[in-house]
């Protein structure tokens, strides 16, 4: 849209052209927006009627219309969503190799359970071989799971689903989980780094586009998918409304790292809070990339070690009694 606007095309022609290239859902949305624009609606209200776009996106469009910089705003939004897509794609690619290893481990365990364990159990029984305690536990557990697999599998699937439903259906439980995400050792550093990078990026884009600071904080807060952080930012909004500085107000929320507060103070002193959010975003996104790469390097060998321990443990549990029997003979 930004490129086509710069080339001089009208907004309704652009939306119609884009709509004809999208799937049915998006095509209907863009064509409906085109009809509304032709009726005299603003671009924001035309998009809002489709109920497909976020409040963040709609606020940015409104700001672009009012300032006459719609093309610039759309370019910023394009970069924002491209970055968001790259991060999500990277996280998905991270999980492919561990997922493959995990599936291989499950397949190997199932093979041992159905093809190996029953035969060894039969040999032990027919020769009156009493396996060691560890082997006995493994073999008995495997035989039990094999016997009641049709009951155990639905239970193992149902329990997480029920827990998820119970948590989702209760706002208080969701708030506790969201707070735990921010406080849990090891995990909280990565999670808050991600939230801070996202929050600062959203704030920079909105302030750059001319959205007032109070509205920017409100919209940036709504985008965050964490009820605990949203409630803490309500404290910040109250203090901003009272006239407190942005750095002091966000500091009172007690959720963001000290680095963010310090950089905001510097931005207030220099009179360029917008640039401060840009620097904060750059800093935390770089830190996030470094930490993500470290996690990738740790996950792959960790999964391999776990797989080796599980498969190796099963093999030892099966083979050990056989060696004991041969030694006894």
Predicted regions and their residues:
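Catalytic metal-binding core of the metallo-beta-lactamase
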Residues: 1-100, 178, 182-301
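Exposed alpha-helical structural elements
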Residues: 56, 133, 140, 172-176, ...
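Bilayer-spanning, highly hydrophobic alpha-helical transmembrane segments
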Residues: 86-166, 286-329
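Juxtamembrane helix-loop transition segments at the membrane interface in multi-pass membrane proteins
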Residues: 126-129, 162-184
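Alpha-helical membrane-embedding segments
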Residues: 151-172, 208-223
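Short flexible/disordered coil segments
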Residues: 169-172, 222, 254-255, 285, ...
